[in-house]
């Protein structure tokens, strides 16, 4: 499940750090979160789609690694990001 450009651009605009930013950890985590949410909805109706489930697990692992990187390098940006995305309680 991929995001179309028109859905991806508002996410990039919201989380970018500077004008041409598309690859900062914040942007990557936000895009992965949206993809994870879409795939989770897909898997609720297609329970036996194990290939997509594997892709979901890979995306969750990738997001976890990016969040760990951000937590170690910039804890204040990490806390702000998880609050905006609602990833923690």
From Swiss-Prot:
GO annotation terms (biological process): translation
CC per GO annotation: cytosolic small ribosomal subunit
Keyword Thylakoid tagged: no
Xref: Gene3D superfamilies: 6.10.250.3130, S15/NS1, RNA-binding (1.10.287.10)
GO molecular function: rRNA binding; structural constituent of ribosome
SMART domains associated with the record: Ribosomal_S15 (SM01387)
The entry's keywords: Ribonucleoprotein, Ribosomal protein, RNA-binding, rRNA-binding
HAMAP family cross-referenced by the UniProt entry: Ribosomal_uS15_B (MF_01343_B)
Reported function: One of the primary rRNA binding proteins, it binds directly to 16S rRNA where it helps nucleate assembly of the platform of the 30S subunit by binding and bridging several RNA helices of the 16S rRNA.
Family according to the record: Belongs to the universal ribosomal protein uS15 family.
Subunit structure: Part of the 30S ribosomal subunit. Forms a bridge to the 50S subunit in the 70S ribosome, contacting the 23S rRNA.
Protein name: Small ribosomal subunit protein uS15
Organism encoding this protein: Desulforudis audaxviator (strain MP104C)
Lineage of source species: Bacteria, Bacillati, Bacillota, Clostridia, Thermoanaerobacterales
Protein's gene: rpsO
